[in-house]
Amino acid sequence: MASTPLLYVLVIILSAVYLLRRRSNPLYAIPAVGPSLPLLSYIGALRFTRHAHEMLQEGYIKYKGSAFRLAQLDRWVVVLCGPKMNEELQRMPDDQVSFLDAAEDLVQTKYTIAKNVIENPIHISVMRGPLTRNLAPLLLDVIDEINIGVEEHIPTRGDEWVSVPGLATMTQIVSRASNRVFVGLPMCRDPEYFKIISNFPRDVAKGRFILSITPTFLKPIIGPLLPWSRRTVRQYSALMKPIIEERQRLLLEHRDPHDPDRPNDFMTWLIEEGRAVDQPVDLLVNALLSSNFVAIHTSSISVTHALYNLAAYPEYQQPVRDELVEVIKAEGWTKQAFGKMWKLDSFMRESQRMFGISAISVIRKALKDVTLSNGTVIPAGTLIAVAAEGTHYDEGSYDNPYIFNPFRFSDMREDEGERIKHQYVSTSSEYVSFGHGKHACPGRFFASNELKAILSRLILDFDMKFGGDGHRPPNQWFGSSIIPSQTANVMFRKRPDAGL
């Protein structure tokens, strides 16, 4: 019994030390949205998984021009609010805040994908370099795959309306078009291949959730035991490793870059990038899988948001269609043509402004203490993000931001000085869907052309609408992720003048 008072004293001392350390930590001087006291913050973290929209909106309204913090199950995230703060974050140097370290913390890449991809992200270099430079010659294959995919997955009959699952159909078409570039024929059409790459984001999410509730000291033990991603990586490797090795042999036989028999595609560029840093085939396999993880997940969501807006606002289909007919008759199905599709470009940008893939963006990890211009101190090791949804609905940046105005940005581009700033792929402190600054999404130029090709084909070939009352179904939120309805169907009817 004598030990009981000693135990009480020890608890009091430890509590006092904890509270003193907490008080001295500048993180806790930043206002919180949701409960912030020890243990109670976990209630806030759980609430965020279901009510992120409301919590982020509350924080943006209260703290615009400054910052607030949000509890996650395994950490606090500091969210910056407003264009001025967005610009401040993207200007911070890489030795102060890190994009790759933030990605590793968020996704736990070394456990959920592969350690070598975060250490040698060769796929990012390929997306930023040869993929972007070769968009024009790649487009013919992409368009061909889209045309075949649309015929297979939207099986219309005469002038009848047919009902097609929106998100699932767009995911199929995006996957085929992207992988026509990533892995080529016939693998891009292989059902087993599609099953593996479409399951992978869910496998990563399951592993990420388990690790988010795992104490830090146990992650090196629990992480390697997670079965889902490891199983998918094995399956993907079994399919792709022989193909990559065969491609390596082919490239050795055709060393001359001007040789017409030398493939010029994503796999070739990955192999060349891997050779430059002397990396094994396993890295190439994981880099291909990671490219699918990033490209297909985000592009499928973005194009589905745009499709749902076309179906919910059918009155805008004809103005876009008229522009498409005029441009394609003059330029053909080319990169130059896609650059002149201002109305379609604006429609896509407005869809992404109002219906992004995430309510936060420009995510970084502080490598050292960060002091903002307003004096707020963010300690080293903290994740920092900007409030993307708040930014995109800010009345200081957009007139009537809650109204879908599909030609908002094409109208802005009528001013010659604004033509580049308001393109779909352009980023700014007021538009952060692709991030902002030098770490903005490197694949957005490929994605822009791919999505324009898909939407152009749909608009030219079909009338589209929702059944019932015709209203767009509500989005589904998973934390800060914004997913278009996974159960909604879109009605398609073949147009009599289809086939341009």
UniProtKB/Swiss-Prot annotation:
EC number: 1.-.-.-
Disulphides: none
Entries under PROSITE patterns matching the protein: CYTOCHROME_P450
Cofactor: heme
Binding site for heme: 441
Membrane topology (UniProt): Multi-pass membrane protein
Keywords: Glycoprotein, Heme, Iron, Membrane, Metal-binding, Monooxygenase, Oxidoreductase, Transmembrane, Transmembrane helix
Pathway: Secondary metabolite biosynthesis
Any one Gene Ontology cellular component term annotated for this protein: membrane
Main subcellular localisation: membrane
Glycosylation (residues): 374
Classification via CDD domains: CYP503A1-like
Keyword Membrane attributed: yes
PANTHER family per record: CYTOCHROME P450
Entry function: Cytochrome P450 monooxygenase that is able to use testosterone as a substrate for oxidation.
UniProt similarity note: Belongs to the cytochrome P450 family.
Protein name: Cytochrome P450 monooxygenase 103
Organism per entry: Postia placenta (strain ATCC 44394 / Madison 698-R)
Taxonomic placement: Eukaryota, Fungi, Dikarya, Basidiomycota, Agaricomycotina
Originating gene: CYP103
